[in-house]
Curated annotation (Swiss-Prot):
Gene3D superfamilies: 2.40.50.1010. GO terms for biological process: DNA catabolic process. The lineage of its organism: Bacteria, Bacillati, Bacillota, Clostridia, Lachnospirales. InterPro entries: Exonuc_VII_L, Exonuc_VII_lsu_C, OB-fold_nuc-bd_dom. This is Exodeoxyribonuclease 7 large subunit. It comes from the Bacteria. It comes from Lachnoclostridium phytofermentans (strain ATCC 700394 / DSM 18823 / ISDg) (Clostridium phytofermentans). It holds the Pfam family Exonuc_VII_L. GO terms for cellular component: cytoplasm; exodeoxyribonuclease VII complex. The keyword Translocase does not apply. It catalyses: Exonucleolytic cleavage in either 5'- to 3'- or 3'- to 5'-direction to yield nucleoside 5'-phosphates. Heterooligomer composed of large and small subunits.
Length: 401
């Protein structure tokens, strides 16, 4: 009968095969990280995969001290380790001892490190962002002299406002030395005194766009005294230049729209500003005229001639009022006098004489209005309407009533 082996024996046998294999005992493997998990023990468990296959991997805590970056999903890495069997599960896996970023992964890591460094230095702080010139006369462009980017910028700028001058600094935008020419372009346009600078290029891979992730370019943008618009690649492409620039445009075409205002809008604004200015000036003139008239009136009131005229008029008015009151008083008194005269007339003996009555008085002038006030022999005077009658009392006779 054939020999029968236990599962453990088979797993152990296979493990020994891996251990004795020179290639598998020390092997470099390249792939993309997925299913990355950090265990509480300090170990890192992850899967290394490519287009058609995958392998389980583990980096024990003792080897993590040599890992210069944080292992994350999607990173392209090269792993040094050994392949062996995990006997409990009967599965083989890569036991990693060293992990390095590879290709794109290394670029992404450099990107994140520089991004973190510049952010900590404050180069991305919004307080450092400069405001674009609203009505630029000159726009500088740092990009390649050939390609779609410069043509898009020229076409859109001329359509929006043909009076804005475009100044191109032909820079190398990818490959060796590209970052230096971009920095030189920024400094040259700053020295020329343009109003706004567009720094960018068309789309491409992360390697193609890498010049705009260089630290020297980021610092040149930050140190520039002129507002800079970053316009690198397409909307989904993000570079360090986008973070440090004063304004990010998703494309070079969008950058031209941001930098160059439409002339129709400018003309409309000018008409509005002219109308507002005229209205403002007219309001100020009206206010000034009103204030002048007010001051003139105040000066007139403070004039000695005006004061004398006012006093003279006051005197005339007072005189007229006094005369009016005097006339009213005279008329009133005359009216009272007329009343008294009428009363006196009504009581006057002379008026009664005209009615046929007479006035009798004795020799002493006392009125004789009773028989008791005279006696026979007394001389009397009888006053009538046209004179006096001298008479003597002959006798008196009482009349019964």
């Amino acid at each position: 009968m054939e020999q029968v082996y236990s599962v453990t024996q088979v797993n152990n046998y296979i493990k020994n095969m891996f251990v004795k294999d020179y290639v598998l005992n020390r092997i470099y493997m390249k792939g993309e990280v997925s299913n990355c998990k950090y265990h509480t023990s300090g170990h890192i468990y992850f899967t290394l995969k490519d287009e058609t296959g995958q392998m389980a991997c583990v980096l024990f805590a003792g080897y993590r001290t040599g890992l210069p970056f944080r292992l994350e999903e999607g990173q392209s890495v090269i792993v040094l380790g050994s392949i062996s069997v995990y006997e409990r599960d009967g599965k083989y896996q890569l036991y990693a001892k060293e992990i390095k970023l590879d290709g794109l992964g290394l670029l992404y890591e450099r990107f994140e490190l520089l991004k973190r460094k510049l952010n900590e230095e404050g180069l991305f702080d919004p307080s450092h962002k400069k405001t674009l010139v609203p009505y630029p006369r000159t726009v500088g462009i740092v990009t390649a002299s050939t390609g779609a980017a410069i043509q898009d910028i020229i076409n859109i700028s001329k359509r929006r406002n043909p009076y804005v001058q475009l100044v191109l600094y032909p820079a190398k935008v990818q490959g060796e030395g590209a970052a230096k020419t971009i920095v030189a372009g920024i400094k040259a346009l700053e020295a020329k005194g343009v109003d706004t600078i567009i720094v960018g290029r068309g789309g491409g891979s992360i390697e193609d766009l890498w010049a705009f992730n260089e630290e020297m370019v980021a610092r040149a943008i930050f140190d520039c005294s002129i507002p800079i618009i970053s316009a690198v690649g397409h909307e989904t492409d993000i570079t360090i230049s986008d973070f440090v620039s004063d304004l990010r445009a998703p494309t070079p075409s969008a950058a031209a729209e941001l930098a160059v205002p439409e002339i129709e809008s400018l003309l409309s604004n000018l008409v509005d500003y002219h109308y507002s200015l005229v209205q403002c000036v007219m309001r100020k003139i009206t206010m000034a005229r009103s204030e002048l008239e007010k001051k003139q009136l105040q000066l007139t009131h403070l004039s000695p001639v005006y004061a004398l005229r006012q006093k003279r008029q006051y005197t005339i008015d007072l005189e007229n009022k006094l005369r009016q009151r005097m006339n009213e008083l005279i008329r009133y008194k005359r009216h009272l006098l007329d009343i008294q005269i009428e009363r006196l007339k009504a009581a006057s003996p002379l008026d009664k004489l005209k009615s046929g009555f007479s006035y009798v008085s004795d020799s002493s002038g006392k009125v004789v209005n009773s028989i008791t006030k005279t006696k026979p022999g007394d001389e009397l005077t009888i006053a009538v309407t046209d004179g006096m009658i001298k008479a003597k009392t002959i006798g008196v006779e009482s009349i019964e009533r």
